[in-house]
């Protein structure tokens, strides 16, 4: 029996996709407490499962301590990178199990660079597939999901996937290597503190430092202004000399003495 596996970005999206495409009510099942849905769409058997955001992250191929620069990295299951991502293992295991009985694969993650990377990694590392169909939708309403399925492309959006993967790698190269360099420099100064910097954080810090340097280097230049407080029937009014700022005190005093007599 031909089975199509659809992979959503998160559990709530998987449920809405299953509800939208099912000929009748989908059957909710679970593996390792991870929910997935079995259904038929126009008589064809489908299974809708989900990721839970990024299932895989970038890490060094071989750990070498706090050395830098490091450029040999690869995608690894998130739970092998961080203990806080232990829950991700059950989602990966569920996709591995479901993919073993599927012959068609469709990615239905959010249609953006992050969604494309999530879908690509689920395909190649959990399902062992090089490519898959791609649903593209902007809302999770039933009409949009049905239309997205009927008009799905036969390949993922490789432009978005490559852009997203490149950004992740640049973030890693920039963040990890420079953070290690900063920490090492602090340690060399007979101190120790873990320092961090990132692709966005670094340039932003540079802008702050430059602005602070400008403020520190600023030397105020004195100037003089001439104002007039007048009285009319409706009350008082305040007027300023048309020159606004006088950069020479003598000039300001001369004009002040002149207008004072008028």
Model-derived features: where do they sit?
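Intrinsically disordered, low-complexity regulatory segments
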Residues: 1-176, 240-260
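C-terminal or mid-to-C-terminal helical accessory/interaction module adjacent to the motor/catalytic core
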Residues: 87-93, 100-101, 143-230, 234
